[in-house]
Amino acid sequence: MWWYLFPNINYNREIKNSKGNIEHIIGKSALKNEDYPNTIKYIKKKLQQQNWKGFIPNLGRDVEAAEVSEDIFKFISKQLDERIKNEKEIAITMPVCFSELQKQCLYDAAVAAGLNVKYVLSESFAAAFSQESFLAGEENRLSLIFDLGGATLDISLVKISREGEDFIVEEMASTGLAYGGTDIDEGILAEIIMPQHAELFKNLTAKGIDYRKKVIEIIISMKERLYEDEEDECDDSDTLGDGNMTEFRLSREDVVQVLEKHGVKERIFTVLEEMFESLPDIIKEDVTDVRLFGGGSYIDYFPKLLTEFFGAEVFDYEDFDPTALDRNDGNQLKTAVAAGAVRYITAKENGNIKVINRIPFHLGIKNNNRFKRILDRNRVWGNSNTGWVKLNNQEVQQDGFVINLYQTFANMPKIVPLTDDGSLIYMGKISLEKGLYDLQKPIFLKLFFDNQGELEAHLAQAKLVDEENQIVDVEVKKFGLGGWS
């Protein structure tokens, strides 16, 4: 078993002397190009956006996140073909804050690329297995996994217990934010670098020079040096394409300023508090240890924040040394997800662990311009099913005969305003065949999980059957949500 790590970057390069042909450059090779308009970065972040599309000049059209994902998986499939000849079984890791349909979108893209997806893991859960100490000792533990990556913050609460020689690993809860290293980089650009060089950027824009992505690369380099080399301030320089060298500076104080302006501490404390409030039998004082992963964990702001929330007796930032973690466990914080996934699969196939997913979530729809919660997956009782929900016909028509579906991990009332604070995750849409419906009659919706764990959506209207009015299915839609670890 082996793992291969690459940046999720897709560069659409036009092949010279081959009219109309485009070569997809994926991963590390794509990082080296400076043809920014034809390059797509951080596709997982774009999968979280409701209607993301990006125009690619070399293609002459927009591309959607699912299409880019499939290109990346085709690249992986080709890499596997060169290394192994037997069936290509893979594990995919995904952010905690992905909805079930976003997970399905990635899963479908992998299958379309010819890959056999055997495991789907949350990134924070996979990261925990990168440490040998995660499955060690005789005592029961309740571990908080904090994984700050490039696009998302993923948090999982995991209970570990022993059953003879085997381990029982229970995922008790998860939460997260659509906030990661890329948001920090963009914040540094907007709040620190742009004000320092406003005139320069104005002149570059007037000359038609696309400087933004190059400056982001400089910011990433300076940020990594600040924390990996334990510097208080660092600098870098570049011509940015106009022939004049410009010097850039970044300090730790600058980074903290950005994080505070973004309200990061308050947002993280809020999702942690809401997670514990959703668990009737667990409080934060039950947590025995905290484990940090992800490139963002190098920024000492986050270890300090976790010490403040849990207390130094559970996690002391002064004892946290990311370089020691790299050395002892043989992998970096940045690659912990991939390495952990391999270790998890090995243990799973050897029969040494039993994994139980107890994470609850709730599904709902946009109804009367609000979120209406209509289906729960409860961590104790399993799945609940809905009765018939009457839709707002006028709203359905205004939305183009689609029903917008949302997911939340938060314990919230049945009906709440639609917000963009991250608590509601857009899942996708249920499209209705307009010609099948009598628009003078109400449309009804019922959601439930079938025996395979797939979500079924039944759309119905009242019809006369044997001289009686009955609610009869007009359409049935299925969404594959089963099998997620």
Kindly label every feature range from the protein language model.
Residues A198-D210, F315-K434:
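Acidic, glycine/GT-rich loop-and beta-edge segments that sit at the periphery of enzyme/chaperone cores
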Residues W3-E14, I160-A206, E247-T270, K390-N404:
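Glycine-rich phosphate-binding loop plus the immediately following alpha-helix
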Residues D35-N38, I43-K45, D450-S485:
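Catalytic P-loop NTP-binding/switch module of NTPases
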Residues M1, L135-E170, A341, K441-A462:
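Gly/Thr-rich phosphate-binding beta-strand-loop-beta motif of the actin/hexokinase/Hsp70
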Residues M1-A113, S122, E186-E233:
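Phosphate-binding loop and its immediate beta->loop->alpha context
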Residues I145-D154, G180-T182, F293-S297, I356-P360, ...:
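A short acidic Gly-Thr/Ser loop motif
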Residues I193-M194, L226-K354, K390-N393, Q397-Q398, ...:
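Helical "lid/coupling" subdomains associated with nucleotide-phosphate turnover
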Residues K118-F146, K334-K354:
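Conserved phosphate-binding catalytic cores of ATP/NTP-utilizing and phosphoryl-transfer enzymes
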